[in-house]
Each structure stands twice: as structure tokens, then as C-alpha cells.
Amino acid sequence: MGTKRISNRFIYFFGALGGLLFGYDTGVISGAMLFIGDELGIQAGSFEDGFVTASVLLGAIVGAAIIGPMSDKLGRKKLLLISAIIFFVGALGSGIGSSYLLLVVSRVLLGIAVGAASALIPTYLAELSPADKRGGIGTLFQLMIMAGIFLAYVSNEWLSPNGWLGLDQNVGWHWMLELAAIPAALLFVGGLFLPESPRFLVRKGKIAEAKQVLLTMNGDTKLVAAEQNLAILNYKRQYHQVG
């Protein structure tokens, strides 16, 4: 019985796309804060000014803390989709930024998604990738973070009053922050087509589904058998072995 084959590159790209959002959000706020204060009445160097940036870290602590137990219950794919939704809502809320409270709450939401992505995505990519390619695939998340930071500085330049588009300072910063909603939407749409982690499927006793994912990713029945056996052994060791 044939199944529609999804390109491994597609899977790895969209699996790691959360890293781009992580990097973009990290870089874009430095440019946006030059103009946010004037519109919202935030004094430079004040507690309120610093907390706009720090609020993401507060959310990231929460996101990283809860993602592990949740991913073991709900699965990597489902939480990747939830993270994309949180990214999208946080990006739009930050870009609207009609008040200081809305901006901070939206940044906390972004932080939750950032923390979740930084803990979830490397694990997800490692569990999907063949053993001989795992190291290289694992670097994709970091590569995406760097790409996101680069794009953030490009957008900061283009959308600033003296930049390529020459937008008014009370308009440009909104767009700087809202642009993150585009890759967030792409992450959600692409994530719908991603497979579940075979390790998670094995943990849930869905051996046939796990084998099919490994077959799709590896295309080698011998390698599939080895990966499947390894996943089963790890599951038994973690959940059934009494030390």
C-alpha cells in the first residue's frame, strides 16, 4: 500500500523553521525599540524599556519548562503546531502594540513559543534524522536562528525612517514586529504535513506507524529495522527498566 512521499528537505526545513522565528525575534527588537518608546511614551533606559526585551526571556523560561512533559503526552508535531500559533498571535500582538501592556503580553507569548521551540525542535529533528546524518541535521536549528537574526537586521534597516522604504518611525516598527507572523504562518501550514516523531510513536505503542515514518525518512528497510529496534530499546530502558 503506497503512501505519498514527502521530501526529506521539506521535513527538515519546516521542522527547523521555528529557529528562524527565534532568531528574527531576537534581532528585530533592537531596531524596533529605537522607535517604540516615542510612540508609547517609554523612557529610554527605564525599567519599562528593559522589560519589553526581557519579557521574552520570562516567557521562554515558561515555554522551555513545560514543553518536555507536554511533548511526551501530546507528541512533537502537535506541539510544533501549537508553538506556531503562539508565535503568530504573539507577532501580531507585538506589531499592533497599541499599548505597553499589549506589547509586553504579546512578547511574553512570543517567549513561550521561543522557549518551546528551542527545546522541542532539536529533539524532533534528531528523532527524525538517520543516525549517519543526525549531527548535520541537528545544526539546522542553529543555522535557522542565524538566518532569522540576519533577516531581522535587514528588516530593521529597510523599515526604519532612513531605510530603503523610508517609513515613518511610528509605522515602521509595527511592521518590523508583525513580519514575524509570515514565517509563523508558514510553520503552521508546513507543520501540518510533517510526520510525528517515530520515538514518540513507539512510546505510544504505535510501532507500525513509527516504522512507516522511518521508512519514509530513510528508504532503507535494514536501517529502518535498526532505528526501530533502537527506539524500542530506549523506550524499555527509560520506562520499564528497574535500575
Task: Walk through the language-model features, giving the residues of each.
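Transmembrane-helix signature of 12-pass secondary carriers
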Residues: 1-243
